[in-house]
Amino acid sequence: MAIVGSGNISTDLLYKLLRSDWLEPRWMVGIDPQSEGLARARKLGLETTHEGVDWLLAQPEKPDLVFEATSAYVHRDAAPKYEAAGIRAIDLTPAAVGPAVIPPANLRQHLDAPNVNMITCGGQATIPIVYAVSRVVEVPYAEIVASVASVSAGPGTRANIDEFTKTTSRGVETIGGAKRGKAIIILNPADPPMIMRDTIFCAIPEDADRDAIAQSIHDVVKEVQSYVPGYRLLNEPQFDDPSLNSGGQALVTTFVEVEGAGDYLPPYAGNLDIMTAAATKVGEEIAKETLSVAGGTR
């Protein structure tokens, strides 16, 4: 398989893929001949190029799977080329050419999709919790607040805050299962940098089974921890009775934090780590499914 993009996210992703029992990174594709990511990939034994996607597509042997961490406009241009070449794509950009995937919630539904999108870091961290609640009770409204270290937010994130909030809000509804969703991102300027912290508010019926909701949240947290070990609850889910402050709804509030594995990105950049870890998880499940359908074993 190939990694398209040679920046920080692609480099962190490379280290995760090299540990995988199911995925074998062979190529890294960039556009900057001086890229540190390409240099690292070469030292680790990958074939590299600074000539872009067209170079990859011109190779006599092509990858089965591409992970792309470039930009939305680059991926929108490349996606039809991948599909024409029979290459599956996992998209870590905001392009959203294919369906958005949150592993605990809807990965199984999209294992045969030619192109899947990893939505946003805030989505990967918070939508699993909304999903955990909505599979137990109806959630008329959910709101997530994602706080990330300012130094971990690159120019792309800063230029696309509105896109982040809209995309994540939509995912809270369509994947998380809330009737209505809202997302807020906070760039925390603290120094030393703070790890990613998220707050998830879900409106629930007054007579909801609180024990069942709490258990569902714990189950989903364990599922996320299977691929993001630094994902954890800060405390037990908090339940509040209906009040004027909550619009007359009962609430469950969940606090999580995400510490990165420190493969290449620093541990405080859990917002980026959860994207590369989730993408690796999706790639592994696609590989397992492909082998299963083909009748093979690994």
UniProtKB/Swiss-Prot annotation:
List ligand-binding residues for NAD(+): 6-9, 152-160, 271
What is the main EC category here? oxidoreductase
Disulfide pairings: none
Do you know which InterPro entries this protein is assigned to?
Acetaldehyde_dehydrogenase, Acetylaldehyde_DH_C, NAD(P)-bd_dom_sf, Semialdehyde_DH_NAD-bd
**Gene Ontology BP annotations:** catabolic process
The domain of life is: Bacteria
Q: Which UniProt keywords apply?
A: Aromatic hydrocarbons catabolism, NAD, Oxidoreductase
Could you name the active-site residues? 121 (acyl-thioester intermediate)
Family matches, as SMART domains: Semialdhyde_dh
Catalytic activity of the protein: acetaldehyde + NAD(+) + CoA = acetyl-CoA + NADH + H(+)
One Pfam family name from the record? AcetDehyd-dimer
EC number of this enzyme = 1.2.1.10
A GO molecular-function annotation = acetaldehyde dehydrogenase (acetylating) activity
Coiled-coil positions: none
What family does this chain come from, according to its entry? Belongs to the acetaldehyde dehydrogenase family.
- What is the official name of this protein in its record? Acetaldehyde dehydrogenase
What organism does the UniProt record list as the source?
Mycobacterium avium (strain 104)
